[in-house]
Amino acid sequence: MSKRDILSVLDMEKDLSEIIDLSIELKKNRYRSYESLRNKVLGLIFEKPSTRTRTSLEVAIDQLGGHAVYLNPSEMQLGRGETISDTGHVLSRFLDAIAYRAYDHRNVVELARSTSIPVINALDDVEHPLQIVADFMTIKEKKGRFTNLKFSYIGDGNNMANSLMLGAAILGTDMYVASPKGFEPKQEFVEKARSIAKQHGSSITITNDPVEAARDADVIYTDVWISMGEESKKGEKEKAFKDFQINEKLVSNAKRDYIFMHCLPAHRGLEVTDGVADSINSVIFDEAENRLHSEKGVLYKLLSY
């Protein structure tokens, strides 16, 4: 069987909806004992800190009958100069899959090229595909559909914005992205998402007006303004994003039954107020829980052979 990598949301273009449905089914049967991935071993290489991704992946494969091995880059020969390629060739002999969280997307691609086992992008500077499965699973649970929705992302045009646009396009969801000038998503992702959206009768709209994005929204989503590794830009970005905070005034433009989403961790008082994050419209903790169930769906899809 040829290996399958998930480095981008595009690697799930043909079966994203199917993976989401599988994840929902696994959640419904969360207390059932599974041995689908018995004796399967998932390696975790994380260059960046993680709460949700690492924990949920470890629990996910355990609940499917396999187990995980955490590999700290600073404790590996990778941290002493061994190449990513050599590391990939060696780990392929021990593991059944690798989840890699990296600062540089090129390193994720290089690892995938050098392994004979699936490589999963567990977040890098370009995309966060695992988060997208959990996000749209949450939307399916809360709204019952992907189409005829206005999904608005308000914030930095970062890796999350890139992946969310691709996910929305694949699933036929109309999406607005509101970012300050100079902080919009990468044009290559906008163009690719619009091309896919056109095939599904949906649209991707880029704006610099957060009120336009929030108006009549069914879903409002945000992320941190300062991503990991961008600490030196804190002052600049806080100034640029001050009108893009998700607060009570902004969400008053949305539909009454809108849901608020955030991939977490949240910097409360910056990109979102406590009033919104803790409101009855907020689904951020359901969304976080769905990291577990959606990753079970992804791992089952990749490794149950």
Swiss-Prot record:
It is found in: Cytoplasm. GO terms for cellular component: cytoplasm. Pfam families: OTCace, OTCace_N. L-ornithine binds at residues 159, 223, 227-228. Carbamoyl phosphate binds at residues 50-53, 77, 101, 128-131, 263-264, 291. The keyword ATP-binding does not apply. InterPro entries: Asp/Orn_carbamoyltranf_P-bd, Asp/Orn_carbamoylTrfase, Asp/Orn_carbamoylTrfase_sf, Asp_carbamoyltransf_Asp/Orn-bd, Orn/put_carbamltrans, OTCase_ArgI. Keywords: Arginine metabolism, Cytoplasm, Transferase. It catalyses: carbamoyl phosphate + L-ornithine = L-citrulline + phosphate + H(+). Coiled coil: none annotated. GO terms for molecular function: amino acid binding; ornithine carbamoyltransferase activity. Its EC number is 2.1.3.3. One of its GO terms (biological process) is arginine catabolic process to ornithine. Pathway: Amino-acid degradation; L-arginine degradation via ADI pathway; carbamoyl phosphate from L-arginine: step 2/2. Its main location: cytoplasm. Transmembrane segments: none annotated. HAMAP family: OTCase. Belongs to the aspartate/ornithine carbamoyltransferase superfamily. OTCase family. Reversibly catalyzes the transfer of the carbamoyl group from carbamoyl phosphate (CP) to the N(epsilon) atom of ornithine (ORN) to produce L-citrulline. This is Ornithine carbamoyltransferase, catabolic. It comes from Thermoplasma acidophilum (strain ATCC 25905 / DSM 1728 / JCM 9062 / NBRC 15155 / AMRC-C165). The gene is arcB.
